[in-house]
Amino acid sequence: DIRVIFASHQDPDICSSLAMWLDLNPAIKTYCSWLWTGFVSHFSTGEVITLNPIPDQGMRIRIGDEGPEVEAVPAHYCHSSGNFSLYDPTAGILFSGDIGGALVPDHHASLVVTDFEQHIQYMRGFHLRWMPSTVALRGWTQRVRAIKPRMICPQHGSIFEGEMVGKLLD
């Protein structure tokens, strides 16, 4: 019973399945940065996808007609110029997209980060290559500190919770 799709940014690992989801349920509301609406609308099997643009400052997104709201948190230039994380204030969970992502070998993989110093080696290369702007990352960390998530869930790698949230933001 999917009602909303949130595309954190324009990459195919986020958007390439949109057409299939919309074929299953054309009523799904799809949100992405205004910057990428023209680009992402072409991830279709024929018809152009209609998207709900997210302004640069972010926005609240209602899940369904009377459901809870989640917040699109700006993460611009943290991998993509029109990038957002998604915060669920009810659960206290921030879905960070690629921020905090890691390429963890199978023999070290775990659902949750328990040793930040061990884990950072799997994050370093990706972040240096795809998120080289410390100014952009500082802006994101300030916004995230203000909302105080109890958990940060990147789309690649392990989850940060408890004290590991603070270590990631530091």
What are these regions (language model features)?
Residues W21-L22, V40, V144:
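Broad structural signal for hydrophobic residues in well-ordered alpha-helices, predominantly aliphatic
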